[in-house]
Amino acid sequence: MFTAKCAMQNIRNVAIVGSGQMGSGIAQVTASSGFNVMLADVNKKALDRAMKAISQSVTHLSKKQKGTDKEKSDFVTLTMSRIKTCNNVSTAVADADLIIEAAIENIDLKRGIFAQIEQSCKKDSILTTNTSSFLLEDVAKGLQDKTRFGGLHFFNPVPVMKLLEVIRSDDTSDETYATLIKFGTAVGKTTVACKDSPGFIVNRLLIPYFFEAARMYERGDASMTDIDEAMKLGAGHPMGPFELADYIGLDTVKFVMDGWAAKYPEVQLFEASPLVDKLVAEGKLGRKTGDGFYSYKK
């Protein structure tokens, strides 16, 4: 059984499962903060891409944060030396004090990963998910010991964004939660606490905001550009809702809202937008495809 003494252990070894944009970013900030990192992915090519991206990002940051050439070189070398890779999840988590799942947003995939993790990790390891849309209780459905499970929701790009949402379910122990807060601070993030609820804090406010903006445009209340301009100049937002949705990806925004609408059909705020549905069906997903609410093709 997971105990208070176990939870308050010193975290030294961190395993990150999933080497995509989020996983590689989490690996970078964790390693640069002095932790040993094992980055795991069943796809060897994905691991190679992740390590290349991390190296480039660390090198870029060293030029901004460090003074002399030696300080820059030492920072890059030391950070990269702390990151190891593995394409076997069971092996990767065997010695980890903290495990962060950062796979794609597929509930069955995440549950399968945690079933494998729980069978292979230490009894006192802390297990976390970086999910941005699923409830912790849904991700942890098959876990035997839910007291050592919590949420660490980083934001993209991880090396740049300062916020970390730390989430607890009804089963998360106080000791586990305190350790996660401590870890978040140790990797240089400002932590905010949230209970297990749809979208946590940021996405729970942000995603419906996108869709309300889309509905305003669909009703003919205002143009996209005027809505964006109004929120930038009137509310002090760095980007308007349409610009930000294009930046995040319309497929991602739609995926989150569709999931909430299915789970909470009585909540009108979660209703779909015909405009968003049309753009996604046409493959116009935002900046990453060159077209979304706006066109980014040169």
Curated annotation (Swiss-Prot):
<dbReference type="Pfam" id="PF02737">
    <property type="entry name" value="3HCDH_N"/>
</dbReference>
<dbReference type="InterPro" id="IPR036291">
    <property type="entry name" value="NAD(P)-bd_dom_sf"/>
</dbReference>
<comment type="subunit">
    <text>Homodimer.</text>
</comment>
<dbReference type="GO" id="GO:0003857">
    <property type="term" value="F:3-hydroxyacyl-CoA dehydrogenase activity"/>
</dbReference>
<dbReference type="InterPro" id="IPR013328">
    <property type="entry name" value="6PGD_dom2"/>
</dbReference>
<dbReference type="InterPro" id="IPR008927">
    <property type="entry name" value="6-PGluconate_DH-like_C_sf"/>
</dbReference>
<dbReference type="InterPro" id="IPR006180">
    <property type="entry name" value="3-OHacyl-CoA_DH_CS"/>
</dbReference>
<keyword id="KW-0496">Mitochondrion</keyword>
<keyword id="KW-0560">Oxidoreductase</keyword>
<dbReference type="InterPro" id="IPR006176">
    <property type="entry name" value="3-OHacyl-CoA_DH_NAD-bd"/>
</dbReference>
<comment type="pathway">
    <text>Lipid metabolism; fatty acid beta-oxidation.</text>
</comment>
<feature type="site" description="Important for catalytic activity">
    <location>
        <position position="153"/>
    </location>
</feature>
<keyword id="KW-0443">Lipid metabolism</keyword>
<keyword id="KW-0276">Fatty acid metabolism</keyword>
<dbReference type="InterPro" id="IPR006108">
    <property type="entry name" value="3HC_DH_C"/>
</dbReference>
<dbReference type="InterPro" id="IPR022694">
    <property type="entry name" value="3-OHacyl-CoA_DH"/>
</dbReference>
<comment type="similarity">
    <text>Belongs to the 3-hydroxyacyl-CoA dehydrogenase family.</text>
</comment>
<protein>
    <recommendedName>
        <fullName>Probable 3-hydroxyacyl-CoA dehydrogenase F54C8.1</fullName>
        <ecNumber>1.1.1.35</ecNumber>
    </recommendedName>
</protein>
<dbReference type="GO" id="GO:0005759">
    <property type="term" value="C:mitochondrial matrix"/>
</dbReference>
<dbReference type="GO" id="GO:0006635">
    <property type="term" value="P:fatty acid beta-oxidation"/>
</dbReference>
<dbReference type="GO" id="GO:0005739">
    <property type="term" value="C:mitochondrion"/>
</dbReference>
<dbReference type="Pfam" id="PF00725">
    <property type="entry name" value="3HCDH"/>
</dbReference>
<keyword id="KW-0520">NAD</keyword>
<dbReference type="InterPro" id="IPR052242">
    <property type="entry name" value="Mito_3-hydroxyacyl-CoA_DH"/>
</dbReference>
<dbReference type="GO" id="GO:0070403">
    <property type="term" value="F:NAD+ binding"/>
</dbReference>
